[in-house]
A protein has these predicted regions:
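N-terminal targeting leaders that route proteins to membranes or the secretory/organellar pathways
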Residues: 1-66, 72-73, 103, 137-140
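Conserved active-site neighborhood of the chymotrypsin/trypsin-like protease fold
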Residues: 31, 83-166, 170-171
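A conserved glycine-rich beta-strand in the N-terminal activation segment of trypsin-fold
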Residues: 35-45, 61-93, 112-114, 146-148, ...
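Extracellular/periplasmic catalytic domains that process cell-envelope and extracellular macromolecules
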Residues: 46-50, 73, 83-85, 120-123, ...
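Conserved hydrophobic/aromatic beta-strand scaffold that supports enzyme active sites
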Residues: 54, 80, 126-130, 175, ...
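Short, conserved beta-turn/loop elements at beta-strand boundaries and strand-helix junctions
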Residues: 62-63, 74-75, 84-87, 99-100, ...
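Residue-level preference for beta-strand/loop junctions
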Residues: 73, 109, 172, 193-195
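Active-site region of chymotrypsin-like
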Residues: 133-147, 176-211
Length: 211
């Protein structure tokens, strides 16, 4: 009787001491998933850093209908804080949504500040907006991060991972990941030449933002 009890205890202890083994194939899958998680964590940190330089730009256009009621239409696009000139905060944005606007405002953490179009580049469809620094609170000024613009000149970018922030999917605050698929196409526009980069990121008709 005593011998049988000892045997049962030994069996239970052995079962508890031997965890279920994982096959090499399963271990490899787990490693790949962990690597993907690490990659997306890094991309997420980069996205959060870049978004510190992004703002939402709202353009308001007024019109009058057939019974003389005033109608307001709004368009929203993404803006990139690039610099200041000591008096104004300078923001780069697409001009398409702003072209016929009666008023333009920029959102700083939900606080709307009036902006004016300072410069327009018709060739690229970009505009520089200006917001007086005096209109921003000290907290807002301290929270501003100026974007660091990159250059693709002389760099082999095909196959490089990229992320689009701003409103790449047509919704504010969205983010898309992809890679550069080509960089060899040259664009000859008025008084200038540009290199066209393409990616495999889905392009929404209402998209705006930066890569």
């Amino acid at each position: 009787g005593t011998g049988q009890g000892g045997t049962a205890a030994d069996a239970e202890g052995g079962a508890a001491g031997n965890p279920e083994e994982i096959s090499p194939e399963e271990a490899a899958k787990i490693t790949i998933l962990e690597d993907y998680q690490v990659l997306y964590n890094v991309l997420g940190e980069l996205r959060a850093e870049v978004e510190k330089s992004m703002v939402s730009v709202t353009a308001v256009t007024s019109d009058v209908n057939w019974i003389n009621d005033t109608l307001e239409n709004t368009g929203v696009t993404s803006g990139l804080i690039v610099a200041d000139n000591g008096r104004e905060l300078l923001i780069l944005a697409g001009y398409r949504e702003l072209e016929d606007a009666d008023s333009i405002s920029v959102s700083f953490g939900g606080d709307q500040k009036e902006a004016a179009v300072k410069e327009i580049d018709q060739a690229t469809g970009l505009a520089v907006l200006a917001v007086p620094l005096s209109e921003l609170s000290e907290e807002q000024r301290n929270g501003i991060t100026y974007a660091s613009l990159g250059s693709s000149a002389g760099r082999a970018l095909v196959g490089q991972p990229v992320l689009a922030v701003g409103s790449p999917a047509g919704a504010g605050g969205s983010v898309c990941y992809g890679m550069v698929t080509s960089q060899g196409t040259a664009l000859g526009l008025l008084d200038s030449n540009y290199k066209l980069l393409t990616t495999d990121i889905y392009g929404s008709r209402s998209a705006s933002g930066v890569i």
